[in-house]
Amino acid sequence: KLIKAVINGQVARKKIDDTALRIVRTMLAFHNARLNDGRSYNETVIGCQDHRNLALKSAQEGITLLQNTDQILPFNRSIHKKLLVLGKLGINDNIGDYGSSRVYSAYNISVMDGLQALLPNHEITYYDGTDPQFAAFLSAQADAVIFVVGFDHDDEGEYVSPNQSSCYTAARGGDRIHGLGLHPDEVRLIQIAGPVNKASAVILIGG
């Protein structure tokens, strides 16, 4: 379309040249800055222990406790030995967008993975929460319940499929049709299974 617009005189060639110049100038500036930096980085630093420690620290300091009714948290390891993890994000490698910012890490640790590694002697059950009533049944049998809800790359994207251009908010990866709140099925899961077990906590993933 752009080439056609230039040929038809709708877009001036100078505008194209000016735009290209700005891009190339910026690329060269960063390239020269890297050459003059004096430091070099190779693949050995990718996923090194220092970087893993920093990632762990960032994750820990990025967690915010929004509410702790009846001081349920922290769970007591000697009392809460039978745990239930609810929600489709409980076993997902949910580490960000799948677009240009996607990161391909050597390994990922889901909430379920982390709990199993931290509490090897505890009984930990997972259910995706598809049936809230069954989730409530499982909740009644657990010592504590952890709901893992929130957003993944399909909710945070910017891409809207052309065949859904007339309904942007419903498009996968576009604006969320239900606004900025949790998905209705996750809200229903918490409302139905949550009250069954007083020792329930919700992990909200967003960002």
What function would you assign to each model-found segment?
Residues 1-13, 45-49, 53-207:
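C-terminal non-catalytic regions of proteins with extracellular/luminal or membrane-system context
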Residues 2-35, 43:
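Long, well-ordered, tryptophan-enriched scaffold segments
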Residues 35-40, 75-76:
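Conserved beta-strand positions in repeat-built beta-propeller and related beta-rich domains
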